[in-house]
């Protein structure tokens, strides 16, 4: 009988696929790069943040103060779309419980690729309301990513915005000094700090790359994020398949 690949997460009280929690750190770096890329590119092309909520709430408040209702609606729509992506990723994950061998993260990344390519095409084609559609597509893609990839090596990560990463970084460091009796699995704060710093650096590098690409290539510059997602998707699928073969042989 094939071993089930699903476990109950003790930290969040939710069912998540084990291949997500055991994913290698390079995937987290790649997704953080994509998160920074999409957020910066979205701001350059659509003047809104597509990867997190806080910045858009501030921009929305400024737009309200300036009585710019069109801009207000734009920022709010991006916020709602990003938040919808999180529970949507959970709904997409449910069918994978029946097919443990299927790869959840590659599926999410495939959907991201479709959304990003569609967003780039819409903006490049100068269709009506192209900027708004672009922002909604990219924010939905990053919302899905944020909901699908949330934990690695036992710590929470956020690959689409730095606020969560900095919070995790500070709290991890604080726990190092505040906790007298720490369980053995959590006694490696140094490696966790390095991991969070590296993910944050990947996000910043992605933001700089994304901004440079869209400033030079305009809407087509977004395809760089889609290309990286395709590479990550193929790599994750191959690793998942090899892991399943080893499990069956064992």
Predicted feature residues:
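Alpha-helical transmembrane segments of multi-pass membrane proteins
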Residues: 2-250
């Amino acid at each position: 009988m094939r071993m089930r690949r699903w476990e109950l997460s003790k930290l969040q009280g939710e069912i998540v696929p084990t291949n997500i929690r055991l994913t290698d750190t390079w995937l987290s770096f790649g997704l953080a790069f994509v998160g920074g890329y999409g957020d910066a590119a979205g701001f350059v092309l659509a003047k809104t943040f597509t990867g997190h909520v806080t910045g858009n709430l501030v921009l929305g408040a400024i737009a309200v103060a300036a009585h710019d209702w069109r801009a207000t609606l734009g920022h709010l729509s991006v916020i709602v779309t990003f938040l919808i992506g999180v529970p949507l990723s959970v709904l997409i994950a449910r069918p994978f419980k029946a097919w443990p061998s299927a790869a959840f993260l590659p599926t999410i990344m495939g959907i991201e690729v479709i959304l990003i390519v569609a967003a780039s095409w819409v903006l490049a084609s100068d269709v009506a309301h192209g900027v708004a559609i672009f922002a909604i597509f990219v924010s939905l893609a990053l919302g899905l990513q944020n909901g699908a990839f949330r934990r690695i090596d036992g710590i929470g990560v956020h690959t689409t915005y730095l606020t969560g990463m900095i919070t995790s970084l500070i709290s991890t460091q604080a726990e190092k000094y505040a906790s007298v009796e720490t369980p053995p699995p959590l006694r490696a704060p140094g490696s966790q700090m390095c991991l969070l710093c590296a993910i944050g650096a990947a996000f910043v590098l992605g933001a700089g790359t994304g901004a440079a690409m869209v400033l030079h290539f305009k809407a087509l510059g977004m395809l760089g994020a889609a290309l990286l997602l395709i590479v990550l998707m193929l790599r994750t699928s191959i690793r998942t398949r090899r892991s399943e073969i080893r499990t069956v042989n064992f």
